[in-house]
């Protein structure tokens, strides 16, 4: 299984994965005003706009995780809770750095919300360096919310094709034994059923079905 470009069928599950992951990581550490504006619908809208530049790991319609790049910024990287600890984040990071290199970016950057210790550890583990604290505009419905973040940067060194391939193959072998998210689209009813059995996707699917993605 390789990292791939997102498809329209990924939209609803990706938005849900992103929203859940954001809440898990950020609710305890961001201002309440930002948390209140960060609704599931807002993540659906943002994912619909950014889907063409999303890279995904996992089956179509049942992603394990994704990353999003904007210019020289690794803007987002999230993994479904069920798939954490299996190397998914590392595979996504490898792909993100490759995409940035291919785009001619020598020193990309990313923003990590202050207090997000798990994300900070992963950044450091994968060779990113904390360079400063800065304020970034966090997107909310109808505007932006100023959020202080840790800014990480990394100088992308050229790696041999063999070393990159070997690392990816090792991680993919580990992923083969991991069971992905249990949620997905019921082919008979067209309802997107979450892992806890909630038929959330019909509402989202109806909304998203009218969009041009």
Model regions: which residues?
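A short beta-loop-alpha structural element at the N-terminal edge
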Residues: 2-16
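Conserved acetyl-CoA-binding loop-helix of GNAT-fold acetyltransferases
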Residues: 85-98, 121, 125
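Conserved GNAT acetyl-CoA-binding A-motif
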Residues: 100-111
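A short helix-loop-beta-strand connector motif used in the catalytic cores of GNAT acetyltransferases and
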Residues: 42-56, 73
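Conserved beta-strand in the GNAT
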Residues: 56, 61-78
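Conserved acetyl-CoA binding element of GNAT-fold acetyltransferases
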Residues: 70-82, 90, 111
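Conserved GNAT-fold acetyl-CoA-binding loop/helix
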Residues: 16-45
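C-terminal "cap" of GNAT-fold acetyltransferases
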Residues: 109, 113-120, 125-175, 180-186, ...
């Amino acid at each position: 299984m390789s990292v791939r470009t997102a498809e329209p069928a990924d939209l609803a599950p990706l938005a849900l994965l992103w929203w859940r992951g954001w809440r898990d990581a950020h609710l305890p550490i961001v201002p309440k005003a930002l948390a209140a504006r960060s609704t599931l619908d807002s993540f659906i809208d943002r994912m619909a706009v950014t889907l063409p530049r999303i890279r995904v790991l996992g089956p179509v319609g049942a992603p394990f995780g994704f990353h999003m790049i904007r210019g020289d910024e690794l803007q987002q990287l999230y993994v479904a809770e069920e798939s954490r600890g299996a190397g998914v984040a590392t595979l996504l990071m490898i792909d993100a750095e490759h995409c940035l290199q291919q785009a001619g970016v020598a020193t990309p950057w990313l923003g990590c919300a202050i207090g997000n210790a798990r994300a900070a550890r992963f950044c450091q583990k994968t060779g990113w360096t904390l360079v400063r604290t800065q304020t970034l505009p966090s997107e909310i419905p109808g505007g932006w919310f100023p959020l202080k973040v840790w800014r990480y940067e990394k100088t992308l060194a050229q790696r041999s094709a063999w070393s990159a391939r070997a690392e990816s193959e090792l991680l993919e072998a580990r992923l083969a034994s991991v069971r992905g998210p249990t949620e997905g689209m019921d082919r008979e009813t067209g309802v997107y059923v979450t892992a806890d059995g909630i038929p959330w996707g019909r509402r989202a699917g109806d909304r998203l079905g009218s969009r041009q993605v």
